[in-house]
């Protein structure tokens, strides 16, 4: 049975344990988050005027990498086919001054820069910049500009430290300062590594003797961070729905071949 346990939730990140799965599933979830969850990003730019020090191509690349809020409630982001809806982000600016992402005017109030303080280009006195940028839904497998964030995972492990190890109290204090769960018995302490934990060099000689690391079978600690396009919990939810839909499609194709 697959189980999820949330360890930490912040506005831009979430950490959770998923249990009852194997490495292929864990990696499939990671890859789906990075490459399959759709977001809005600038895909084409029409320049009407550019007197700045940067070429059109450089500014277009900068615009493409600006995270745009993606209204997940309005689109079926877990669908295998994407909506071809296009949003226009326009700009008309004159120097002197810095042009920021917040200066972009969107044709859709729900699709706009997630951070208004991203620099685009600095204009000198008399320099002008005018363009229309067109944002569309896309997936990270086609270009990194459509990746919704970053995700990584690790095995959930337990570090058993015998009380025969000199200075074992130091390890206990270090783990507690890191916010790691520590269980203590008469013979040992057990540190659950819900986040990365590195033993000080002085304890390395005790590995395999008084200190041993145990991998908890079928359990992984995931950390997911959002760029701002989508709420971080929606990224995980959409990725799981996409995985299920792809699995259903694969099973249906197998049944067709069997028939």
Swiss-Prot record:
Main location: cytoplasm
GO biological process, one term: DNA-templated transcription
Molecular function, one GO term: protein dimerization activity
Protein location: Cytoplasm
Keyword Nucleotidyltransferase included in the entry's annotation: yes
Protein name stated in the entry: DNA-directed RNA polymerase subunit Rpo3
One matching Pfam family: RNA_pol_A_bac
Record-listed E.C. numbers: 2.7.7.6
Catalytic reaction(s) noted: RNA(n) + a ribonucleoside 5'-triphosphate = RNA(n+1) + diphosphate
Record function comment: DNA-dependent RNA polymerase (RNAP) catalyzes the transcription of DNA into RNA using the four ribonucleoside triphosphates as substrates.
Gene Ontology cellular component annotations, sorted alphabetically: cytoplasm; DNA-directed RNA polymerase complex
Keyword tags: Cytoplasm, DNA-directed RNA polymerase, Nucleotidyltransferase, Transcription, Transferase
Keyword Cell wall biogenesis/degradation: no
Assembly information from the UniProt record: Part of the RNA polymerase complex.
Family the entry assigns: Belongs to the archaeal Rpo3/eukaryotic RPB3 RNA polymerase subunit family.
Species: Thermococcus kodakarensis (strain ATCC BAA-918 / JCM 12380 / KOD1) (Pyrococcus kodakaraensis (strain KOD1))
InterPro entries with a match to the protein in the record: DNA-dir_RNA_pol_30-40kDasu_CS (IPR001514), DNA-dir_RNA_pol_insert (IPR011262), DNA-dir_RNA_pol_RpoA/D/Rpb3 (IPR011263), RBP11-like (IPR036603), RNAP_Rpo3/Rpb3/RPAC1 (IPR022842), RNApol_insert_sf (IPR036643), Rpo3/RPB3_RNA_Pol_subunit (IPR050518)
């Amino acid at each position: 049975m697959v189980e999820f346990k949330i360890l930490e939730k912040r506005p831009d990140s979430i950490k959770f344990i998923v249990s009852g799965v194997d490495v292929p599933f864990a990696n499939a979830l990671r890859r789906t988050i990075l490459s399959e969850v759709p977001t809005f990003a600038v895909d084409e730019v029409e320049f009407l005027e550019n007197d700045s020090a940067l070429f059109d191509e450089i500014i277009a690349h900068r615009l493409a990498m600006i995270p745009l809020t993606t209204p997940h409630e309005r689109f079926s982001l877990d669908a295998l086919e994407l909506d071809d809806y296009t949003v226009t982000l326009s700009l008309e600016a004159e120097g002197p001054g810095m042009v920021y992402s917040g200066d972009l005017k969107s044709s859709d109030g729900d699709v706009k820069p997630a951070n208004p303080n991203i620099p685009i280009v600095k204009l000198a006195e008399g320099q002008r910049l005018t363009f229309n940028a067109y944002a569309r839904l896309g997936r990270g497998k086609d270009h990194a500009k459509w990746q919704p964030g970053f995700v990584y995972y690790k095995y959930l492990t337990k570090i058993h430290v015998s009380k025969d190890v000199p200075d074992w109290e130091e390890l206990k204090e270090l783990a507690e300062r890191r916010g790691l769960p520590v269980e203590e018995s008469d013979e040992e302490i057990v540190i659950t590594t819900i986040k990365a934990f590195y033993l000080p060099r002085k304890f390395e000689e005790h590995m395999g003797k008084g200190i041993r690391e145990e991998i908890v079978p079928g359990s992984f600690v995931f950390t997911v961070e959002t760029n701002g396009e989508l709420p971080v919990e929606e990224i995980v939810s959409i990725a799981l729905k996409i995985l299920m839909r792809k699995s259903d499609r694969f099973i249906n194709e197998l049944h067709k071949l069997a028939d």
